[in-house]
Amino acid sequence: MTRSVWKGPFVDGYLLKKAEKARASGRNEIIKIWSRRSTILPQFVGLTFGVYNGQKFLPVLVTENMIGHKFGEFSPTRTFYGHAADKKAKRK
C-alpha cells in the first residue's frame, strides 16, 4: 500500500537541514545519511549523499529521475555472488 497523498512525502527533519547547509556552502561534499526511508525531494537534485547500507556509505548523486523514490533504493544492502555453477556441466 502506498502512502496517503494528504500526508505528503516522508523526509527526516535533519536531512532537510543538512541539504540546505550544503547548498548554501556551495561545496560538493558527500552528505552522510542513515535515513534510507526518506523520500528524495526536488531540493536534493545535484547533491551527493552517502547512504548507509549497514556496512559503509555508498555515494548517490541525486538526479531528476530519482525524485519521489526512497534513498534506500539506490544503496543495496545485500551482495550477490552469482548462482552456483552446475558441476556436471563443468566436467563436459
UniProtKB/Swiss-Prot annotation:
One of its GO terms (biological process) is ribosomal small subunit assembly. It holds the Pfam family Ribosomal_S19. GO terms for molecular function: rRNA binding; structural constituent of ribosome. The keyword Endoplasmic reticulum does not apply. InterPro entries: Ribosomal_uS19, Ribosomal_uS19_bac-type, Ribosomal_uS19_CS, Ribosomal_uS19_SF. Disulfide bonds: none annotated. Keywords: Ribonucleoprotein, Ribosomal protein, RNA-binding, rRNA-binding. One of its GO terms (cellular component) is cytoplasm. Belongs to the universal ribosomal protein uS19 family. PANTHER family: RIBOSOMAL PROTEIN S19P FAMILY MEMBER, SMALL RIBOSOMAL SUBUNIT PROTEIN US19M. NCBIfam families: rpsS_bact. Protein S19 forms a complex with S13 that binds strongly to the 16S ribosomal RNA. This is Small ribosomal subunit protein uS19.
